[in-house]
Amino acid sequence: MSTPTISADTTAQNATSTEVREDVNKRGNIDNYIYGPDERVTTYFVREIRPCAAFSKLPVLLTNGNGMKKFGGTFTMPINASGDYLLSLTAYATLSAGTITGAGDASVVSWLPKLGHKLIKSVKLKIDGKPLVELSSSFMDMWSEFMIDSGNYEAYNNMVGGEYEFNKDRINNKSVVLPIPMYFSRDTGIALPIGAMVNNRVTVEFVFRKVTDLLVLENKPATGAGTGVVRTLTEADFSVVPTIASFEVVADFAVVTDFEIDRTSCTPHYMYMEKPVDVPATELVKPTDGTTAPDTMSFEIEHTNGIVKALFFGVRNITRPEYLDFYKVGLPRFNLGAREDVGTATVSRIGIKCNDKYRVPLLPSEHFVYTEPYHAAKRVPTTNNGLYMYSFALDLHTIDPKGSINPSNFNSNISVVLRPSETLNAATTERFEFNATVLTGYILYVENGNLRKIDNGGDFN
């Protein structure tokens, strides 16, 4: 190898396009594999326009409905066919300020983080009074951790309520914006054809939590470490009770041409839909007779009629019911005036079984909180890393199944197998439960003005 030299370069000229093209035209064996034969491929440095029928987006404000727009209430809004396709739903809520009394000098109070997820216990999109899709606050927590990309996560977190804001006795007023993660909001190609569903009544139902379920009262001493949650709040603790000052929903519709309406109404309109199904929570019961806890615990996932695209799950710490989304061993508390989260992992290894065989072997839990979301989701959780996911699909964000499984085809039940961490086994004063949500897929179609669903049974229920 020759020794490099350093010299002044005063004669070099810029290459011309003709000279560069001569280099590009030269081919070796490896170039033929990389670029392919010229007669079969072309590189276009021109923006190609994908033509479509003319349409326009139409936002519509929904304010009227039946029920109670208040804490602990249920409110149902009709979604009239203001357009041809329903693209998305976004909820806007304003909560008034409040004050508490008698909490003690060393106590502080705050709304829970991501308040929009907690305020709405569940939201149901109904067709003729039957739920088509139901989203729980637990699902919205899990979905946002994995499926809101890092570039938008901070903004999204602020929209839905942000983090804790502790005060001595005052509860701040809050405004939250919640983009409701319905399946069709990710891809307009599967927008709900509400204009064609002339024989169906479409509504959206919101179930609100009680105000006492949305606040946490913690101990914050002037010096030293705090003791965590002081007590569960009751309505008697308020001198001024917060209220839902306003609640409204914006529905985005697409309005298309008469030609497209006529053409799509000639034959049944088929489309894919996704439906999250919450698995009933199961408390982890530890032996009390002095025997050793089992090495692994298995939790059966309720069988569904549709395909299974992904699993979201975690072991929630339920020692204090105020924490609706805490999935670690060791509760947070104030220390030297700062709030500390010193929680540790609840699980060391995770596997997934179909019937009695491992579809996914017992792998380190990090595979389900880091590797899986890195490959299949939009974001790897950075703080709430007690949540886990496994995606059977290669890309969870797209609506394409891409590897989703249908347990009905092989008459199989799915089970999540957990090996508890050492800290979980040693946590004798804390209680835990297994939470899971299954993301399932179905085929919908509109025929003769009615929406129907294809699964192993027939119409949607």
From Swiss-Prot:
Annotated region Disordered: the residues are 1-22
Q: Give its localization.
A: Virion
Give the matching SUPFAM superfamilies: Group II dsDNA viruses VP
InterPro entries registered for this protein in UniProt: Capsid_N, MCP_C, MCP_C_sf, VP_dsDNA_II
Q: What are the GO MF terms of this UniProt record?
A: structural molecule activity
UniProt KW Lipid biosynthesis keyword: no
- Listed disulfide bonds for this chain? none
Presence of keyword Aminoacyl-tRNA synthetase: no
What Gene3D superfamilies does the record point to?
Adenovirus Type 2 Hexon, domain 4, Major capsid protein Vp54
Superkingdom of origin: Viruses
One cellular component term (GO) for this entry is: viral capsid
Q: Which Pfam families match?
A: Capsid_N (PF16903), Capsid_NCLDV (PF04451)
- List compositional bias (Polar residues) regions by residue number: 1-18
What this chain does, per the entry, is described as: Major protein of the capsid.
The protein in question is named Major capsid protein
Organism, scientific name = Spodoptera frugiperda ascovirus 1a
